[in-house]
């Protein structure tokens, strides 16, 4: 699939549910109880939990989010990927599609505490050989935050991203996004632990970076991302280590 066709597919997947939702909402409601936003990004690499999903090549990404004043939300996010075909050339699955819904809100006297509860489905449409473990994954998550710091726990009752017999894997994520009050910069820091119920597949990932608000809905992010993932587990069929440390950048437009 060419990049232009892939971009069109991602934009179509992101925009169609949003268009349908907007048309169903009264004009006044779109700015009162209901909020609908979209996003489109170009990234030097798609890194998920520290592991490259595009074999260290650029990715195009996009999605939409709907939220209600009650705290209920749902959304869809999509990205170009290559890791499935990189692991087996008989696989043709160039897009990741994520669908999620949940409830998040603030609490406490100062309103600085927050919580987020939800479910996330990862879907990888494509063609797979008969003996290939499907990568479709469901996660249930719970998060709590205070100010710029947040902690999130995600639990997978299904197999995790194509690992056979990996049910009940989980991921713990500690993140901080601290506004620096200079040049529109925010400091981004993250450390996570991916527990995979498969020998030698668990690992730690970390990230340190900066995001700059460019105005008009644009944001530029740069970071260094790394892991301690086992090379024998996270090396693709081409012999390339998927968890290698890397400098990374993305440009995002929110609308």
Question: What do these predicted ranges mean?
Answer:
Residues 63-65, 100-102, 118, 141-143, ...:
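Outer-membrane beta-barrel architecture
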Residues 42-48, 68, 78-82, 105, ...:
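Transmembrane beta-strands of outer-membrane beta-barrel pores
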Residues 30-82, 246, 252:
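Short glycine/proline- and aromatic-enriched beta-strand/turn motifs that initiate or cap beta-hairpins
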Residues 34, 56-60, 93-97, 113, ...:
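Residues that define the transmembrane beta-barrel architecture of outer-membrane proteins
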Residues 70-74, 108-115, 148-153, 180-187, ...:
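Repeated loop/turn-to-beta-strand initiation elements of outer-membrane beta-barrel proteins
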């Amino acid at each position: 699939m060419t990049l232009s066709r892939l971009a069109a597919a991602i934009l179509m997947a992101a925009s169609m549910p949003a268009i349908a939702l907007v048309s169903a909402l009264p004009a006044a409601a779109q700015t009162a109880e209901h909020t609908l936003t979209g996003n489109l990004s170009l990234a030097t690499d798609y890194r998920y939990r520290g592991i490259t999903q595009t074999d260290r090549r650029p990715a195009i990404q996009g999605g939409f989010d709907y939220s209600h004043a009650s705290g209920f939300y749902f959304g869809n996010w999509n990205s170009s990927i290559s890791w499935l075909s990189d692991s087996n050339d008989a696989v043709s699955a160039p897009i990741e599609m994520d669908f999620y819904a949940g409830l998040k809100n603030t609490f406490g006297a100062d309103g600085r505490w927050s919580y987020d509860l939800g479910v996330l489905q990862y879907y990888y449409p494509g063609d797979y050989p008969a003996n290939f473990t499907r990568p479709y994954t469901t996660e249930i998550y719970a998060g709590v935050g205070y100010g710029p710091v947040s902690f999130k726990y995600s639990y997978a009752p299904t197999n995790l991203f194509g690992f056979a017999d990996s049910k009940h894997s989980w991921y713990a994520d500690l993140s901080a996004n601290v506004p620096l009050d200079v040049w529109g910069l925010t400091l981004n820091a993250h450390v996570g632990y991916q527990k995979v119920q498969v020998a030698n597949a668990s690992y730690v990932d970390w990230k340190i970076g900066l995001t700059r608000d460019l105005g008009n809905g644009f944001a530029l992010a740069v970071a260094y991302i790394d892991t301690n993932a086992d090379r024998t587990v996270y090396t693709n069929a081409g012999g390339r280590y998927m968890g290698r440390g890397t400098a990374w950048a993305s440009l995002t437009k929110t609308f």
